[in-house]
């Protein structure tokens, strides 16, 4: 048995936003009351000053397995996930080979279950080999356990293919998610087209490369009546397009990454390849737009786009180095900062970190409720910690946050009634 004492529980699903004790027996939440007395043989966790929420779900991570496990693998990725308070993650299909066949889908699920730290689920490719030419066998992949379809890392440039994919996935009760980038506009750009790129002489990547593809996908959703999900939305205009599409009745959802809520293109001022990400880091105006869109519900939830790369890969010259940065361990402190700055409250934080992403992939969100299996995150909202190579649990350490201090630290993560992470 485990008794969690004195923690402040936040779970809008059960109208909880107060200080309670939680008694967990054989993995199940037995009691949620004030002043539960400890007894012999019971592990007591003193959560005074801590916040307890349902554990988090991230529908967009890159665990690089199969094919690039020198960057990350399912075990190291799972360790990073639970250290960030996550108990469900969805792996992207830009592996080697791509997740476009049933055996690879099964491999991801079985490997995650074998490790057992968190729920590791696969997405599957929209097109074979992620080449944008021919649709995968979506029905077979979904039956094998793929939770949705995406060619993430690359857009679906062919609008006819994208329309057919939306119709096929929608008929199966799932959805497609698009990496919205018009390659004819982005060319080989590396930094947001603006003052910073111009001053540094960096190849510019215009925001229209994202905006036009977001508009296309939203229009296809309106016309077909089928759902579409916008990955890592990052521009003010894209936010406005999604708001318009939702007002038109489109079944469109959107995610935003922690780095697009927190970091700007000023990270390039030291010419650091660590700052290269796709879509690129944007301006303060774009960040402000995404923050308020997340608060209002135009953006539905947070997804980290956790993208590990080896040190030597990120030390190449800008055009050669791969885009991407870590995110799983930094999402909580970044989103929590928005709570502290009054963009939204803790209830909304739980919505965007836990409830809405779980619902999006058809899962019942974790709940803090008597009779439920404990899937909880306990964090200290005021603990400051340094991001360094020791505190990062991923194999790779590629983040512009190295050496910086963040406030908000996960102390315990419960998965299927067991403690899978303790700080």
UniProtKB/Swiss-Prot annotation:
Alphabetical UniProt keywords: Hydrolase, Metal-binding, Pyrimidine biosynthesis, Zinc
Gene3D superfamilies: Metal-dependent hydrolases, Urease, subunit C, domain 1
Cofactor(s) needed for function: Zn(2+)
GO cellular component: cytoplasm
UniProt binding sites for Zn(2+) 1: 60, 62, 152, 305
Note accompanying the cofactor annotation: Binds 2 Zn(2+) ions per subunit.
Coiled coil: none
Entry-linked SUPFAM superfamilies: Composite domain of metallo-dependent hydrolases (SSF51338), Metallo-dependent hydrolases (SSF51556)
Listed HAMAP family: PyrC_classI_B
Protein name: Dihydroorotase
Organism whose genome encodes this protein: Sulfurihydrogenibium sp. (strain YO3AOP1)
Gene name for this UniProt entry: pyrC
